[in-house]
Regions:
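Histidine-acidic metal/acid-base catalytic patches
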Residues: 2-87, 207-325
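Active-site acidic/histidine proton-transfer and metal-coordination neighborhood
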Residues: 19-30, 42-52, 80, 114-229, ...
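Short acidic/polar active-site loop segments enriched in Thr and Asp
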Residues: 89, 121, 161, 289-290
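Conserved beta-strand positions in the central sheet of alpha/beta enzyme cores
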Residues: 90-92, 124, 164, 259, ...
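Glycine-rich, proline-tolerant flexible connector loops at the mouths of alpha/beta enzymes
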Residues: 92-111, 170-171
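Short catalytic-loop micro-motif centered on adjacent basic/acidic residues
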Residues: 92-93, 198-203, 267
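Metal-dependent catalytic neighborhoods of phosphoester/phosphodiester hydrolases
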Residues: 101-109, 138, 175, 303-306
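Catalytic-core regions built around general acid/base machinery
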Residues: 107-117, 183-187, 247, 279-282
């Protein structure tokens, strides 16, 4: 799809202007672009034996959602907490934890400085609750695109490489796919000016059908549109699951990030619902060498312990798989 339909074609300046007003567009554009060029790089620990690791490990903010929603952890302290508690050097934000601050550059500057203070790199922002990019009504899709624009600028300001979006929508599978693809193309036209990718996660509904999502990405036909494969989000509807290993394999050709979803662990430290070794082989065989994000969602272990268990598993398998290559 080289040219999106007229309903979504005027996306770059005109949609920004309608969403933010001329002054808002100028402020967001200058702040986001300048930050994208000057964002601080986080220090990474030297790999054991002087070898480059097969992948870095990052932490998705959702892993600590109970602590954050419960008031035990402030979103601004997430970078410090990540470094001091887990020794990790990259984070993935969720907009739900600072939804009122997407265009608040005082807040974002504070968050960015805290990342710099603790040697933390900002990877991406996961965007939820900003409208259905695959809606049947083009006006609804346009509004959803507009609501995502501030997060593109915020991501650039923080030094991220991407935003993660959802492909929820309506219609037949074919209609839904085409509608979502149009919105993704429109968002990517803006995102490329900020050095950002627009990534779709398998996140329930049709997006958890790996074949459907892969085809939607192909239809979007933009180098800045990609995927964020999640190891566990393959429930299409109640009682209907897509094969998670097939799904990740289908999404990896477009991947710019990967989410290692975990829930529980056995006595040997292996995840009980997903064969992480098999998943990591799929990821690595696709040629991916970017960060893999911990996203713990379990209930038996407290969040901090669940993150640590996931981290230990990823580190162990990283060494095992590196030795076999």
């Amino acid at each position: 799809m080289r040219n999106p339909p007229p309903a979504l074609a005027p996306t770059r300046r005109t949609l920004f202007a309608s969403a933010l007003g001329a002054g808002g567009w100028i402020g967001l554009s200058l702040a986001g672009r300048a930050a994208a060029q000057t964002a601080p790089a986080a220090a990474s620990p030297a790999p054991a034996g002087g070898r480059e690791p097969l992948f870095e490990i990052s932490l998705a903010q959702w892993s600590l959602h109970k602590l954050l929603y419960g008031g035990e952890l402030d979103a601004l302290d997430f970078p410090r907490f990540t470094r001091e508690t887990f020794g990790l050097g990259e984070v993935e934000y969720v907009n739900s934890f600072f939804k009122d601050h997407g265009a608040d550059f005082t807040y974002l500057a504070d968050l960015r400085q805290r990342c710099a203070d603790h040697g933390i790199r900002s990877g991406l922002i996961m965007i939820d609750g900003e409208g259905n990019l695959g809606a049947a009504d083009p006006r609804e899709r346009r509004k959803a695109c507009e609501r995502h624009f501030r997060w593109i600028s915020a991501a650039a300001f923080l030094g991220c490489r991407a935003i993660r979006v959802n492909a929820a929508g309506t219609g037949t599978p074919e209609e839904h796919s085409q509608q979502a693809a149009e919105s993704l193309h429109a968002l990517a036209e803006v995102a490329q000016d900020f050095g950002q990718f627009v990534l779709v996660e398998n996140h329930g509904g049709r997006s958890s059908d790996g074949s459907w999502l892969a085809e939607t990405i192909r239809r979007a036909d933009h180098p800045r549109v990609g995927t964020l494969p999640d190891f566990g989000n393959f429930q299409i509807e109640a009682g209907v699951w897509y094969d998670r290993y097939l799904g990740v394999e289908q999404l990896m050709p477009f991947a710019q990030a990967v989410s290692a979803k975990s829930h529980d662990f056995d006595a040997e430290g292996n995840e009980t619902g997903t064969d992480f070794r098999r998943m990591l082989r799929i990821v690595l065989d696709a040629g991916y060498r970017g960060p893999i994000g911990i996203e713990y969602e379990g209930s038996r272990l407290p969040e901090v312990e669940g993150v640590r268990a996931t981290q230990r598993l990823l580190e162990r398998l990283r060494e095992e798989l590196a030795a076999a290559r």
